[in-house]
Design a protein with these regions (language model features):
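Short coil-to-beta strand junction motifs in C2/discoidin
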Residues: 31-35, 114-116, 149
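Acidic/polar, glycine-enriched structural segments that form the non-catalytic walls/loops
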Residues: 73-75, 96-106, 120-125, 138-150, ...
Length: 481
């Protein structure tokens, strides 16, 4: 349990027991601060910062290390809150001896090409050229596909010396992908369903929608990585054991099928045999179970808004549609680059491609209890607000262009908030909460002129792009109040 701190200045002393320290060990100060902080060990200044940090670390220099002794030591800190959030936390850590290096050679990256829905990488791995593509089929005209929580990692391996070579592809994922902080307990396992084999991981606690705010990572629901059962072998265990097994040509499944924390690394292996050319892919996804709390009601993700689908249904659909979706993504990426380049030149086109996924992934698609589409944004490092109107406004052109219904989804929650009487002020709210909890505005200040202007202009833009004034008519009472 922490000590409540309202703001201003705070001073903290902690007594810690330190065992005998080896000269070969590196000690670190682990700290979080908001805002200005200075840290000391036994009266010796270690570190000072004017910037906000969360779970950061700094190696102790020779003077700070020399100030430590075996037994009791006093770590102290002072922190000044200059406004907004206030936090101070700190401790010591010792760097553990690293795991033995198993994968001795590093692939040489030749290129990276970021497109709207895909990123393409080229590597040279000795006598093998390897192309790797990450695909997120975020096609905005298809809401079912847009909300499907499954992406692809594809690869093409080809000999660069004209000879056949034994080729196997190894994929590894850490359980940290499903945790807020690294020290949380996790559990990973292998799951078989139909023609697919999965590795799955999630936190032990599974506190659904229990956290909100900035610098938070989802720690409920489960991460999945999957491949065709006929060509994919799965394993769970320590990273060193899985990698050693792979390098030695063993079966990673023999390492284990279930494990927690450090023993919960997940691996998939696809053995291509002795080849000159081959290709394949795996699927990755995340089932968040419930995505948003919307005025005291927990909402499922849009793809499972009726609660009648499973994550395995989504993976199966993604597997069946792999070839067709890759073609659609290739076509869309080409068209976006061509349109953008014709409009603003090559550099502008590259910026559009870079921003496409970023803008989309800043939002979550759910359906409101009244059937409205909700396309809810999250502010990063700015209160963590959800559905912020002045964040909606600059992202709106993308959604107006490709699917105006999503632009409606940027505003539906704000209209509902006022029309329901929950927000009684004569201008739009700034937000509807702190992500992912949308129970009402949490930002400290109103912005009546800015937010009203944003809502009026965007409503007019939706009607213009839809060539239909129905959306404005639906909310006419609020627009003219």
């Amino acid at each position: 349990a922490g000590t409540f701190w309202k703001g201003g200045n705070v001073w903290v002393r902690r007594t810690v027991n330190v065992p005998e320290i080896s000269k070969d060990e590196t000690l670190y100060l682990i700290y979080s601060n908001d805002d200005i902080a200075t840290f000391y060990i036994n009266g010796v200044k270690v570190f000072s910062t004017n910037e906000v940090h969360h779970n950061a670390n700094v190696a102790l220099d020779a003077m700070a290390t020399a100030a430590l002794k075996a037994g009791e030591n006093v770590i102290s800190a002072t922190c000044e809150d200059t406004g907004g959030l206030a936090v101070l936390d700190f401790g010591l850590a010792v760097k553990r001896e690293g795991e033995k290096l198993v994968l001795l050679n590093t692939a040489k990256q030749i290129s990276a090409d970021v497109q709207a829905t895909q990123t393409h990488y080229n590597f040279v791995c000795g006598p093998i050229d390897l192309q790797v593509t990450f695909t997120a089929p975020l096609l905005l005209n298809d809401l079912e596909l847009l909300s499907r929580p499954v992406n692809y990692i594809s690869y093409k391996a080809s000999s660069n010396d004209g000879k056949k070579h034994d080729v196997s592809i190894y994929f590894e994922a850490s359980p940290r992908i499903a945790l807020d902080y690294p020290f949380q307990d996790s559990m990973s396992e292998i799951v078989y369903d139909g023609d697919m084999v999965y590795v799955k991981s999630g936190s032990v606690s599974q506190g659904i929608l229990q956290k909100k705010g900035d610098d938070r990572r989802i720690d409920w629901g489960y991460f999945y990585m999957a491949g065709d059962n006929g060509s994919t072998v799965a394993g769970v265990g320590k990273a060193s054991a899985l990698r050693s097994c792979f390098v030695q040509g063993g079966d990673v499944n023999s390492i284990g099928s279930k494990g927690g924390n450090d023993s919960g690394r997940m691996a998939l292996v696809q053995n291509l045999g002795k080849i000159k050319k081959a290709d394949g892919h795996v699927l990755i996804g995340y089932d968040d179970i419930y995505s948003i709390q919307y005025f005291e009601k927990n909402l499922r993700p849009y793809w499972n808004r009726n609660g009648d689908k499973s994550i395995f249904d989504e993976f199966n659909s993604a597997a069946k549609e792999y070839s067709s979706l890759i073609k659609k993504c290739d076509k869309f990426d080409r068209e976006l680059m061509l349109d953008a380049e014709n409009t603003g030149g090559r550099e502008y086109a590259e910026l559009c491609a870079l921003a496409y996924r970023q803008a989309i992934h800043a939002h979550k698609l759910v359906e409101a209890p009244n059937g409205d589409i909700l396309w809810l944004s999250k502010e990063n490092n700015s209160n963590g607000s959800i559905g912020t109107v002045d964040v909606t406004y600059p992202s709106a052109p993308l959604f107006l262009l490709y699917n105006p219904k999503l632009a409606e989804g940027l505003m539906n929650h704000i209209f509902y908030y006022s029309e329901s009487g929950r927000w009684a002020k004569p201008f739009p709210a700034h937000d509807v909460g702190t992500y992912p909890i949308a129970n009402g505005q949490t930002y400290g200040g109103d912005m009546p002129v800015e937010e009203a202007g944003n809502m009026l202009i965007l409503t007019a833009a939706v009607c213009h792009y839809e060539k239909d004034a129905s959306y404005a008519a639906k909310h006419w009472g609020m627009l003219t109040t």
